[in-house]
A protein has these predicted regions:
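Cytosolic, long alpha-helical scaffolding segments
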Residues: 1-222
Length: 222
């Protein structure tokens, strides 16, 4: 195999590893939402324990990127792909972390929130939007689809709206009954993590735009 063909093969393997990691992070978020919906503390614990797998995948991808950079002197297009992978891997890892963060809250949350709690239902609906953003961002990354990436960025407005609406509901809840502060704070942390997951999906989408254009947040890089 020629040096160029080997290099192309290594780049494709890097992309495959990145997509697989994204799928694992998305699954962790989906499972966290399901555990929240069903008050399943055992499932929540499994999510926390499974976070190491995503962390290990991050280290593997970072190693692949550094190997590609050290073994070759990539031209602009290749360098954009490697640089994007090094940035995106951090956002994906944080998505997995936030799924684990939510899972850690669930055992206490289910003791202070009744089944069918409307604020929890709103948080789950918000989370499903953030989860869909992950799927769409990873699809955009796989296809290097700038238009799809733009849709992910736009979708974040709905997640932010939900975050502010639920936060307002929780503030009213505390004002009406200060004894509910723990229950409110637990859910506030959950929606904050969900909001951050949406932000990380946006970051992935913005790096997709960079791969296609060489511009990141409207600034030319290379």
């Amino acid at each position: 195999m020629s040096i160029r063909k080997q290099y192309d093969s290594d780049l494709e393997a890097l992309k495959t590893a990145l997509v697989e990691m994204g799928q694992n992070a998305a699954e962790a978020v989906e499972n966290a939402l399901e555990a929240l919906c069903t008050a399943d503390t055992a499932a929540a614990q499994k999510i926390v324990q499974g976070d190491d797998r995503i962390n290990n995948m991050e280290r593997d991808i970072e190693h692949r990127c550094m190997t590609l950079l050290l073994r070759q002197q990539p031209v602009a297009g290749d360098l954009r792909h490697i640089s994007t992978a090094m940035k995106v891997v951090t956002d994906i890892e944080r998505m997995g972390d936030h799924a684990s963060d939510i899972a850690e809250i669930i055992p206490h949350l289910v003791t202070v929130r009744k089944e069918g709690d409307p604020a929890v239902s709103q948080a789950i609906a918000m989370g499903r939007k953030a989860y869909q953003m992950i799927l769409d961002a990873m699809d955009a990354l796989t296809a290097e689809d700038e238009i799809a990436a733009r849709r992910v960025i736009t979708a974040d407005d709905a997640v932010d709206y939900d975050f502010n609406a639920i936060k307002h509901t929780l503030a009213q809840e505390i004002a009406a009954d200060p004894a509910k502060v723990d229950a409110a704070l637990d859910l506030l942390m959950v929606i904050k993590y969900l909001e951050r997951i949406g932000d990380h999906a946006v970051n992935v989408a913005e790096w997709v735009q960079f791969v296609r254009t060489g511009r990141y947040k409207d600034e030319s890089m290379f």
